Regions:
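Functional transmembrane core segments of multi-pass inner-membrane proteins
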Residues: 4-110, 149-154
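Hydrophobic cores of alpha-helical transmembrane segments in multi-pass inner/ER membrane proteins
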Residues: 11, 106, 132-141
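C-terminal transmembrane module of polytopic alpha-helical membrane proteins
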Residues: 138, 143-154
């Protein structure tokens, strides 16, 4: 098994743990985000020529999320922001944007369901980490083909 495959397997394990913990507690432990960031750093070390897209990936979603939190209280949790920074280091900027897109779509659909079923109100919060994790896994496994398909329309 290649190092890249082992790293992807480790990332999937971390994301599964993050999803389960966040769904139950609405918190993402820093140690999980740190483990994901270590996987990102290892992936950069395995292909050092491609380091810049990974650094941009760590910032391209997490910084706007942080800035949005400064404007809208509670827009995202700190764990969500750190999760996307760590995932961005692993994924690179293009797949990080794709992961965020899928996370927002999945989380938005769940939020609409909660509102429609009257299980939550507009001011209620729910764990967003599991949806971000789903987006990260999709981007990690299918990012290339999805981006190629999308770019064919441009």
């Amino acid at each position: 098994m290649s190092w890249a495959a082992l790293l992807a397997l480790a990332v999937c394990g971390i994301l599964l743990s993050v999803s389960l913990i966040d769904a139950e507690t609405q918190t993402i432990p820093d140690r999980m985000n740190l483990a994901l960031a270590v996987c990102g750093a290892v992936s950069v070390l395995l292909s050092p020529a491609d380091w810049l897209p990974h650094v941009i990936g760590a910032l391209c979603v997490s910084v706007p999320m942080f800035l949005l939190c400064l404007v809208i209280d509670g827009a995202f949790g700190g764990g969500d922001i750190k999760l996307m920074a760590a995932a961005g280091l692993f994924l690179g900027w293009q797949n990080t944007l794709l992961a965020m897109f899928f996370g927002i779509v999945f989380g938005g659909m769940y939020g609409i369901y909660l509102l429609a079923a009257k299980k939550a109100g507009k001011k209620d919060h729910f764990a967003f980490g599991p949806f971000l994790c789903a987006g990260i896994v999709i981007a990690m496994l299918f990012g290339g083909p999805v981006l190629e398909w999308y770019c064919a329309f441009l």
